[in-house]
């Protein structure tokens, strides 16, 4: 292979790598909360695994309405405000689901969160993890808001 072909392959390889990196968002921030329950994972998942069941266990949610296809939930917040969220992935075998925020008053963009339940001795460990960028607020303020949402649930 001559030098010109090697240069062309190198340039193409770098271009492909840059394109791949550009297609995956780099989240600036993350929040998480871990809770424990004496109940078995299946019991816990029955309570928190219903995508629109959040109104039954999160004190900030007044009402949840689910779209006909079950993929979008509209959350009416106590005190006013609405958040629309999309179910991105559900894995019942792994006791988890992931969702994104479509729109709402939270100071975040590119938000993706996963709630999962795992066996923990005779009980369960509940993990709520979110990755996002701050929008219209500082990183610290966005993290404070999302951390508060997670701790409240």
Residue spans for each PLM region:
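Bacterial N-terminal signal peptides
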Residues: 13-23
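Hydrophobic ligand-binding cavity/cleft-lining segments
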Residues: 24-66
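Residue-level marker for the onset of beta-strands and adjacent loop->beta junctions
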Residues: 31-33, 60-62, 71, 83, ...
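Extracytoplasmic/secreted envelope proteins and their assembly/folding machinery
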Residues: 41, 45-51, 58, 84, ...
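Hydrophobic pocket/interface hotspot
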Residues: 44-48, 54, 73, 87, ...
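Hydrophobic-ligand binding "helix-grip"
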Residues: 66-67, 76-123, 131-133
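A conserved amphipathic terminal alpha-helix motif
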Residues: 125-127, 131-153
